[in-house]
């Protein structure tokens, strides 16, 4: 077990995980690991290689030759696929709608989980995703399960898309999120589920600062000797 301090934040799509995790990491001076970005990058890699998303073995073979890395950036950290920056490209609708399938492949998860654990074992981390508290960092000192209503999550995604010049109507986003929730919670390998020792935090109707404050108090309590 690592002697570093590990904070796991899990939850469904658009619950606010990455937004909250980034702020906490900055405040605590911890390393932020966006595991979802790793799966998204692999999804984009498959697309760029001309692979069908259903080609599990092809995706697994490609992963062995794929380097995924992060670099600090403002306002968000930068993501690289081999030597190309893909920070924006991995947020496309096509990647979003296919990442659950790529993430369901056993060998893909095993490889990326190993990479994620290597990072967590060398420094203090905040890691967010779907299975951090249950699979990736089962011994994390703090586990948070972040949730929000489907409508609120769709509205958040709508605002994000609009800011990027992308137009997808609210009802479509609601449907996409419900579909993603089902895929994530029903996959055979590491489904989205609240760890038994995770603390549930509902962000519906809450400001970002209120959620950050609530989780900061949880962390401080755990850090007391």
From Swiss-Prot:
<keyword id="KW-0418">Kinase</keyword>
<dbReference type="GO" id="GO:0015949">
    <property type="term" value="P:nucleobase-containing small molecule interconversion"/>
</dbReference>
<comment type="similarity">
    <text>Belongs to the cytidylate kinase family. Type 1 subfamily.</text>
</comment>
<keyword id="KW-0963">Cytoplasm</keyword>
<dbReference type="InterPro" id="IPR027417">
    <property type="entry name" value="P-loop_NTPase"/>
</dbReference>
<dbReference type="GO" id="GO:0036431">
    <property type="term" value="F:dCMP kinase activity"/>
</dbReference>
<dbReference type="InterPro" id="IPR003136">
    <property type="entry name" value="Cytidylate_kin"/>
</dbReference>
<protein>
    <recommendedName>
        <fullName>Cytidylate kinase</fullName>
        <ecNumber>2.7.4.25</ecNumber>
    </recommendedName>
</protein>
<keyword id="KW-0808">Transferase</keyword>
<keyword id="KW-0547">Nucleotide-binding</keyword>
<dbReference type="GO" id="GO:0005829">
    <property type="term" value="C:cytosol"/>
</dbReference>
<dbReference type="Pfam" id="PF02224">
    <property type="entry name" value="Cytidylate_kin"/>
</dbReference>
<dbReference type="GO" id="GO:0006220">
    <property type="term" value="P:pyrimidine nucleotide metabolic process"/>
</dbReference>
<feature type="binding site">
    <location>
        <begin position="11"/>
        <end position="19"/>
    </location>
    <ligand>
        <name>ATP</name>
    </ligand>
</feature>
<dbReference type="GO" id="GO:0005524">
    <property type="term" value="F:ATP binding"/>
</dbReference>
<dbReference type="GO" id="GO:0036430">
    <property type="term" value="F:CMP kinase activity"/>
</dbReference>
<dbReference type="InterPro" id="IPR011994">
    <property type="entry name" value="Cytidylate_kinase_dom"/>
</dbReference>
<keyword id="KW-0067">ATP-binding</keyword>
């Amino acid at each position: 077990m690592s002697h570093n301090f590990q904070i796991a934040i899990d939850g469904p799509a658009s619950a606010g995980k990455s937004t909250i995790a980034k702020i906490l990491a900055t405040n605590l001076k911890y390393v932020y690991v966006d595991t979802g970005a790793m799966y998204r990058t692999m999804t984009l890699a498959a697309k760029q290689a001309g692979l069908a998303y259903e080609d599990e073995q092809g995706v697994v073979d490609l992963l062995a030759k794929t380097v995924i890395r992060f670099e600090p950036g403002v306002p968000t950290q930068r993501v690289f696929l081999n030597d190309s920056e893909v920070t924006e490209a991995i947020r496309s609708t096509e990647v979003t709608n296919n990442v659950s399938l790529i993430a369901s492949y056993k060998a893909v998860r095993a490889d990326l989980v190993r990479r994620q654990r290597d990072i967590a074992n060398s420094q203090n981390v905040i890691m967010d995703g779907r299975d951090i508290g249950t699979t990736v960092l089962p011994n994390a000192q703090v586990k948070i399960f972040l949730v929000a209503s489907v409508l609120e999550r769709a509205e958040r995604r709508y605002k994000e898309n609009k800011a990027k010049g992308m137009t997808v109507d609210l009802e479509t986003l609601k449907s996409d999120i419900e579909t993603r929730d089902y895929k994530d919670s029903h996959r055979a390998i590491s489904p989205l589920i609240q760890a038994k020792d995770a603390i549930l935090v509902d962000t519906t109707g809450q400001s970002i600062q209120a959620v950050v404050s609530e989780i900061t108090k949880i962390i401080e309590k755990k850090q007391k000797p």
